Design a protein with these regions (language model features):
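A structural signal for short, well-ordered beta-strand segments and their strand-loop junctions
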Residues: 152, 186-190, 238-242
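Short leucine-rich amphipathic alpha-helical surface patches
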Residues: 178, 190-193, 227-234
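Phosphate/ribose-phosphate-bearing ligand recognition and processing surfaces
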Residues: 193-212
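N-terminal donor/sugar-recognition subdomains of glycan-related enzymes
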Residues: 1-61, 71-76, 205-210, 216-244
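Metabolite-binding pocket within alpha/beta catalytic cores that recognizes anionic/polar moieties
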Residues: 2-6, 10, 40-124
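Glycine-rich anion-binding loop/nest that anchors nucleotide
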Residues: 63-68, 170, 185-199
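Short, basic, glycine/proline-bearing loop/turn elements
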Residues: 58-65, 78, 156-163, 208-209
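Acidic/Gly/His-enriched mid-domain segments of enzyme catalytic cores or analogous surface patches
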Residues: 85-86, 94-184
């Protein structure tokens, strides 16, 4: 999705959630400054190092969300030849993958997941796409320097080293990242778009699952709409395991 197309979505999201464009831009500037000082990846670097070199120029991707179906879908995916797929995890899904001894190739995160697991995945080779927005300035400042192999994104107009490929939540941003990296086939695991959340997306809940709050429910509605945009406007073959 190009930035002009995204702008319409972005304005709607700002109005619907009461978010601040200025807050997003402030955090984007902070993330860009940190990455400028520490060094960061370009989208070309990410493609060359992960898609082209590590995964032999595959055009197949698996996107892992943190929905209730995630563990069931991981069991299905264990039967795939994962050498043929780029694995992109949305933030909290990383924990579930580590529990099954799977290291994602790329993690899309706004750094609000289980930090110890994110650091473990990074130390074991996972690349990071770190997203700055108005509500995570503190996490960006605290944790960005702790990660290696980082590409930065924003949901506002890109500045400096940052990109905006489209997408709002970690899961749908992972989908749009896959498209930017050349996806022709995209398997979705743990992408439920429902009203139930898991401990992987909300570590503070009691038990394995719980009801999504109003904000989370609205975010998941946008995530599903953004998936539908992909289905309607691209030629990517999307296989959602929730339908299997």
């Amino acid at each position: 999705m190009d930035i002009n197309e995204w702008e319409g979505w972005y304005v709607e999201i700002l109005e619907d959630f009461g978010f601040s464009r200025e807050g997003d831009e402030k955090t984007a500037d902070l993330l860009d400054k940190i990455l400028e000082e520490k060094g960061c990846l370009t989208i070309g670097d990410l493609y060359n190092e992960v898609v082209y070199t590590k995964k032999k120029d595959t055009d197949k991707f698996i996107i892992f969300g943190a929905g209730p179906s995630l563990k069931k879908h991981i069991e299905i995916i264990k039967n795939y030849n994962l050498d043929n797929y780029v694995l992109i995890a949305a933030d909290g899904a990383t924990t579930a993958l580590l529990e099954e001894d799977i290291i994602p190739d790329i993690i899309a995160t706004d750094v609000d997941g289980k930090i110890s697991d994110l650091l473990t995945a990074n130390a074991n080779g996972a690349y990071f796409v770190i997203h700055g927005h108005g509500n995570n300035e503190e996490n960006i400042e605290m944790w960005t320097d702790s990660f290696n192999k980082v590409l930065g994104t924003t949901q506002s107009i890109p500045v400096g080293n940052l990109y905006n490929f489209g997408g709002f939540t970690d899961g749908d941003r992972a989908m749009y990242l896959a498209i930017e990296l050349g996806a022709n086939e995209m398997v979705l695991a743990g992408m439920d778009f429902g009203t139930i959340v898991t401990k992987y997306s909300r570590p503070d809940i009691e038990g394995e699952t719980g009801p999504a709050d109003e904000i989370k429910t609205k975010k998941l509605i946008y995530a599903e709409r953004l998936l539908n945009w992909i289905l309607e406007n691209t030629d990517v073959n999307v296989i959602n395991l929730i339908d299997s």
